[in-house]
Amino acid sequence: MKIIEGGLAAPQAQIAIVISRFNSFINEQLLAGAIDTLKRTGQVADDNITVVRVPGAVELPLVAKRVAASKKFDAIIALGTVIRGGTPHFEFVAGECNKGLGQVSMDFDIPVSFGVLTTDSIEQAIERAGTKMGNKGSEAALSALEMVNVMAEFK
């Protein structure tokens, strides 16, 4: 029996991080966690990491699609924060972002790691951006690194 699992070191990988500016005080912490993990765990060089900033979470899938279509990257990490408010806007934004990023991955055969927080409060978002619930940006980077190595097994 053959078991394929991806390691975390991917020093030659080209990684794109697409990040929303909306809720930037949280997203910048996610970005710091992702970059730290890519460099320290994945051994990815600065020159192999590209950061693309977009206005909000709704724009993440479109830009991720363009990044994927460029064929220059081995994985994409999407980072953002969507916080529930008093209107149904949260469901629309979170749902379309999730669906769109998943579609990019399937359409372009590239790992798209979902590091978009969807929380009920600012406090929950802060907890997931490097305080008591860990850093979801770092976790998204770990997923991207592992998937780069898994996908390489099928080339």
Swiss-Prot record:
Pathway: Cofactor biosynthesis; riboflavin biosynthesis; riboflavin from 2-hydroxy-3-oxobutyl phosphate and 5-amino-6-(D-ribitylamino)uracil: step 1/2. Pfam families: DMRL_synthase (PF00885). 5-amino-6-(D-ribitylamino)uracil binds at residues 22, 57-59, 81-83, 114. The active site is at 89 (proton donor). Transmembrane segments: none annotated. Gene3D superfamilies: Lumazine/riboflavin synthase (3.40.50.960). It catalyses: (2S)-2-hydroxy-3-oxobutyl phosphate + 5-amino-6-(D-ribitylamino)uracil = 6,7-dimethyl-8-(1-D-ribityl)lumazine + phosphate + 2 H2O + H(+). Belongs to the DMRL synthase family. This is 6,7-dimethyl-8-ribityllumazine synthase. It comes from Psychromonas ingrahamii (strain DSM 17664 / CCUG 51855 / 37).
